[in-house]
Swiss-Prot record:
Assembly mode: Associates with the 50S ribosomal subunit.
Function according to Swiss-Prot or TrEMBL: GTPase that plays an essential role in the late steps of ribosome biogenesis.
Disordered: annotated span: 166-195, 454-493
Ranges annotated as biased composition (Basic and acidic residues): 454-463
UniProt name for this protein: GTPase Der
Binding site for GTP 2: 204-211, 251-255, 316-319
Alphabetized PROSITE patterns for the sequence: G_ENGA (PS51712)
Gene designation per UniProt: der
GO biological process, alphabetically ordered: ribosome biogenesis
Family recorded in the similarity comment: Belongs to the TRAFAC class TrmE-Era-EngA-EngB-Septin-like GTPase superfamily. EngA (Der) GTPase family.
Length: 493
């Protein structure tokens, strides 16, 4: 499971700066959930091949009122959600009463905490350690978040307490370094979780019907092997079989009664949702048809797209809607979900079971598309045909040349294209290639990533040194050129 690390501390100690420093590899703040998780931001970060989730929180000063009290409450909640806490203090300002209050809270919660002395760029780190030693959280780790100093050592300490899971040890996703022999049929790359079948995460906003859908999927022709509580925050992993196919449902909805439909007010945990997406092969994204597409839906869909997981969209509570309402919702889906137009959309009623059975076909097709590998000859042939139909643009009077393509990874499919001037390939042309590969390979429900690699210039970075013979020749040419110029000037006079 992906570790979750919370950044806490009083205001203006550099939490947001450190958050941006840690998440810059993905260059994104995943989501801001106003009203649900006020002033908590969730980001995904990577360090030395390891993925982890960072929670940025509001400052805690101990004298909050009104909205500030709400922000402090959310910061304390982030501590409960996290697997480890990075407690930031300001080395320049020294220890304060607020620092002591937060340290006392962390000690009481018995949470694995690391004391981080920020802003040591102008202060002796040893002095900072001595200053904050009375907090009783061990030696402070000195960093300068603004300049990136001490970050690697800090992450080594913080992430070192978590065991690496199999996916991290084998590399992210399913690498496809092993080539398919020319002429072979495309094959499926077995994933590390194949013994549990396809892992399906049911995600969505609160009260869109996730619990009802889970119960409905388990209640139809089910053979439940066992219910196993997840290791983190009540996520439930439920292996089951349907039509001799193995699946594992990852239920993030919380309260659920097996055997009967039970729709409670769902406890929404961003951490649970993000971890479920990371651990799944396919995500079923549940939306409320009566509410349409809202901003929270787009935030979560953006994270699914960023992680590269296969996607199926289920529009729940479709029954009982008037024809005009349905037409409006379909128009909104076409307009606002263009960035995930590769995903199948199902209109269902989890309560009555309408359309639920069709989800399995889309799940299987999406998974198959995400983990299939293709030979280099096939991918190159598709590239050549695409270039012949629509050539890349000219750059500085020269045509971009795309020479060949091969598979660089799976889940999601990564197609590596080699050529010249590939840094100048426009995004619009990349989208054209993505759609071409999707259409020809008949890929459904999975994003495609295209990576370009240019040819290496063996003389790049080397100074052009002339031989003695070349130097003499250059001098003669320059001398001849000067004499010719002088004759021209004399004639003009």
């Amino acid at each position: 499971m992906v570790p979750v690390i919370a950044l806490v501390g009083r205001p203006n100690v550099g939490k947001s700066t450190l958050f941006n420093r840690l998440t810059k590899s993905r260059d994104a703040i995943v989501a801001e959930y106003a009203g649900l998780t006020r002033d908590r931001q969730y980001g995904e970060a990577r360090w030395q091949g390891r993925t982890y989730i960072v929670i940025d929180t509001g400052g805690i000063s101990g004298d909050e009122e009104g909205i500030d009290a709400k922000m402090a409450e959310q910061s304390l909640q982030a501590i409960e959600e996290a697997d480890a806490v990075l407690f930031l203090v300001d080395s320049r300002a020294g220890m304060t009463a607020a620092d002591q209050m937060i340290a006392e809270h962390l000690r009481k919660r018995n949470k694995r905490s690391f004391l981080i002395a920020n802003k040591v760029d102008t202060i002796d780190p040893d002095l900072a350690r001595a200053e904050f030693s009375p907090l009783g959280l061990g030696d402070a780790l000195p960093i300068a978040a603004a300049h990136g100093r001490g970050i690697n050592h800090m992450l080594q300490e913080a992430l070192g307490i978590f065991p690496k899971d199999n996916a991290e040890e084998e590399g992210e996703g399913e690498p496809a370094s092993e080539e398919v022999a020319e002429g072979e049929e495309p094959t499926r790359i077995p994933g590390p979780s194949e013994k549990d079948g396809i892992k399906i995460a049911i995600i969505g906003r609160p009260n869109v019907g996730k619990s009802t859908l889970v119960n409905r999927m388990l209640g139809e022709e089910r053979v439940i092997v066992y219910d196993q509580a997840g290791t983190t925050r009540d996520s439930i992993y439920i292996p089951f079989e349907r039509n001799e196919e193995k699946y594992t449902l990852i239920d993030t909805a919380g309260v659920r009664r097996r055997g009967k439909i039970f729709e409670a007010v769902e406890k929404f945990s961003v951490v649970k949702t993000l971890q479920a997406i990371q651990d799944a092969n396919v995500v079923i994204f549940v939306m409320d048809a009566r509410e349409g597409v809202v901003e929270h839906d787009l935030n979560l869909l953006g994270f699914v797209l960023e992680t590269g997981r296969a996607l199926v969209i289920a529009l729940n509570k479709w029954d009982g809607m008037e024809a005009a309402e349905r037409d409006y919702v379909k128009t909104e889906l076409e307009r606002r979900l263009l960035f995930v137009d590769f995903a199948d959309i199902h209109f269902i009623s989890a309560l009555h079971g309408t359309g639920v059975g069709h989800l399995y076909k889309s799940v299987q097709e999406s998974f198959r598309s995400a983990v299939t590998r293709w030979p280099t000859s096939r991918l190159t042939s598709i590239l050549e045909d695409a270039v012949q139909v629509h050539q890349p643009p000219m750059v500085n009077g020269r045509r971009i040349k795309l020479r060949y393509a091969h598979l660089g990874g799976a889940n999601p499919p990564l197609i590596v294209i080699h050529g010249n001037q590939v840094d100048a390939v426009p995004k619009a042309y990349t989208r054209y290639l993505e759609k071409t590969y999707r259409r020809v390979l008949k890929l459904v429900g999975t994003p495609i990533r295209i990576e370009y690699k240019g040819g290496e210039n063996p003389y790049e970075g080397k100074k052009n040194s002339l031989t003695a013979r070349q130097v003499n020749k250059k001098r003669r040419l320059m001398s001849h050129h000067k004499k010719a110029e002088k004759k021209k000037k004399d004639k003009r006079r």
